[in-house]
Amino acid sequence: MTRFGDIDQWYRGVYAAKKVGFSKIKLNVVFLKGFNESEICDLVAFAIDNEFDISFIEEMPLGETNSHDRSETQFHSVDVKSNICKQYDLIETLERTSGPSKYMRVVGTRTRVGFISPISDNFCNLCNRVGVTADGRLLLCLGNENSVDLRSVVRNHPGD
């Protein structure tokens, strides 16, 4: 949820959003074998306790990473779902968001659990997403590193 960031800052932001009345908060978690797989059910419990939705995302093989070897950390959505089902009952839902997430509901709660599976269940034909990186680059495809530098556009055309 923060990668290598400040988890306390993350908590403050999430609780501030809840406090001011955001009614639909969704947590996005990239899961990695050997890093955070043991936290999956704790994160679902946190989402349930706060009536948040949560989506688990398979890591996309984009960019360089020095923090881990992707071949050793790849963890598929079916494995995450299996871990969750050991502790919670999940049911299929017909809800669609026009996005890549496939949702299930935790029985007896308001929480939806989504699975975004670019590796194990390619969704390119259904994707309607673009991304903005932390350094202001617009990614027209989440699976491609070609991008547009939004920061320079905004700085060079501040009134537009």
Language model features: what each stretch is:
Residues 1-57:
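Radical SAM/AdoMet-radical enzyme domain recognition
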Residues 63-160:
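Accessory C-terminal segments flanking Radical SAM cores
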